[in-house]
């Protein structure tokens, strides 16, 4: 027999998730409805707040993500009440959320922002570490201090940043694509960045972008939750700031990339000994193809689909994320996308009445602008959380609103290998078929510029380095001006194209 529940709490608006999408949504609702209690349900004692927000251009934005105790959010917005508990069940027909602490929370409008969890290449293996939230990033730092060699599996943003930031440790990087950073770059941009990996890294300027709060009193509880598979909110931009990512050896970069392969099998030390297979030493030279058997004994061994086997201290699984829908699906008839996310329409509404979703948990199921696509990035989490709050507010007072302008054009600014990286529109010619052309300009070690054109109109761009072209290119994509007359002059470094299009 279940323990009797406490009397239900009621909030006109309830938000689930303490990550960027959830906190942004709750803050916006609190501003719109200062006399209403906004309930924010989160499994973590800390929340992720957007700070130093800067609108760089019409759609490009920059911000930091700061981890804060939830009390700071409640102090800023007295009408936000944070409930620190995981969700046990959603009863959509009763408009009720049951939390793991045994309480019930009644809502009129609900927004699900529970994020995503890392796809692990192997569940339950102590030598496989997924990096998704601050707890797992700090666990990674701890493991790295004892490591001589690690293997990184994956080719997304976290893998790219890790490979560049790690020092004093051999890194074997396994990617299933031909070139690095396939989510973000074509082979040309990948080549431009790869050269940076070979160079010695300059001493980084110590620029602490945000405060990290440790919650000592909760450490055991947090570890218990983490091992139970609980999900922390996603890492924000510059997540590795403040982490000392150094291994045991005295050198900067030692990276070997194994392309076009995946993990075939993982062996623990004893299993590998019994198998009588041979592992390889760390390749010393990209041009030297000679194979040497590794005499060193490692805690874990990885066999790749290209038949190579390497030993290492531990494996980092950075192979993407899965929307964290599990607590909400049972007993509720949500429409779910192919990627496992809750489908939302152009007002962030799910298929169930009064339930919205934003951030990594959702799948954009509307007909998108020709130069926008969903990617599970922190910029989109902020935009979706903000817009979902606007939609919930409008619906609750019977108003209709237009879709937010941020969904007109995909725009993301980040840093990889210490270069500023701006991605605009269909930057990798996604979905354009063969009917497109590329204009390229590259100055080794300085900048890489790619414009994607279709029928003379710019559809996307990649800008690496301090190019100062983001606003001009953003305008050219948005206004769809025919650029055929300019030809390759568009990227001529001797022509100031900003003067053309002011």
From Swiss-Prot:
Ranges in a coiled coil: none
Taxonomic lineage: Eukaryota, Metazoa, Chordata, Craniata, Vertebrata
Key words, A-Z: Acetylation, Cytoplasm, FAD, Flavoprotein, NADP, Nucleus, Oxidoreductase
Residues that bear N-acetylmethionine: 1
Functional note: Probable FAD-dependent oxidoreductase; involved in the cellular oxidative stress response. Required for normal sarcomere structure and muscle fiber integrity.
Name of the protein this chain belongs to: Pyridine nucleotide-disulfide oxidoreductase domain-containing protein 1
GO cellular component, one term: sarcomere
GO biological process, one term: cellular response to oxidative stress
EC number: 1.8.1.-
InterPro entries assigned: FAD-bd_OxRdtase, FAD/NAD-bd_sf, FAD/NAD-binding_dom, FAD/NAD-linked_Rdtase_dimer_sf, NAD(P)-bd_dom_sf, Rubredoxin_C
